[in-house]
Structures are given as C-alpha cells and as structure tokens.
Amino acid sequence: EKDTVDFQLNFDDSEKEPTVLPTRIPNLLINGSSGIAVGMATNMMPHNLSESIDGCIAYIDNRDITIDELMQHVKAPDFPTGGVIYGMEGVKAAMHFGRGRVVVRGKLTVEAKANGKEQIIITEVPYQVNRDALTNRIGELVNEKTIEGISHVNNESNNKEGTRVVIDLKKDAIANVLI
C-alpha cells in the first residue's frame, strides 16, 4: 500500500511477495537464526540489542562503512546464556566472510567445602548447550574413567537463581587440573 519495499513473484509465480520485511529494529541480527534446507544450512549468532541499533545508525550515517568500523559498534555475538568468547579471529571471520568458528566457554568458579574437598561451580554455559545434557555427559565420562577426580555432578539450575551446575571433586582432586 505505502510502496515501502519492492515486491517480486514467489517461487511458483502465483503471487507477489516483499523482497524484504521492514521492521523498526534488526530482529534477525538481534535474535540470530539457525536453519537447515536442502543443500544448505545457516547459523546466525544473536547480538546485543543496543550494539545492533548503534551499528544500524552508523550504517545509515555512512553507507560506505567498513566491516572493521562497524565492529566498533557491533563488537561480537551476545549469547543469552552467557559464556566467554575465546579469541576474536572467528568473530572477525564471521563478520567479514559470513563464516567463522567462535569458541565459547562457560564461566565457572572453584569453591572449597568445609570438609576440605573442592567444588567446581558452572554459572554460565555456552549458547545452545543443554545443562542436563552437559551434566549427563560429564557423568558418562566419569563412569567411563575418561575423567577422574569427580565424585558427583548435579544440575542445580532453576529459573529464579539461573545456571548452577555443581561438580563435586574427590578429596585428592585438584580443580585447576580438571578444568
């Protein structure tokens, strides 16, 4: 009606569809996307809302902005489950070429218990890592004797407190070695 965007014929030429879907904010960049089709797949990482808006404003102000200049506004993906991105080379490759390997590690702390044993407390997990699956996998590795020094693993996460995966260590285990 308002002639906002161009239209093109759909896959079977039966009707016209918009070439883009206008929006007030860059939803795809903010929310990310993951999908598989015949012969191709896509994974777009989510980004911070305010950084994304700043990036859009910078692009509007300078249509010839370079990717490096744009990355001063949109610095890196922003994962809803937290975690720490290790190395920016993968992020830079993803921004420049649409492909890149981004390594994300969870956040953890080591706590000493009253009985002298230590616990590893995981408070953030990488994006799309299921906490129950993580807990089960650690348990499997302990049972297979691939990892030694762990006496118990428990997922104490909840909606109120957030992520909390507790790994109890055996008395002689050294947390920094297991990490």
Give the positions of each predicted feature.
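Intrinsically disordered, low-complexity regulatory segments
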Residues: 6-31, 36-179
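Proline-centered turn/helix-capping motifs that create local helix->coil transitions or kinks
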Residues: 1-5
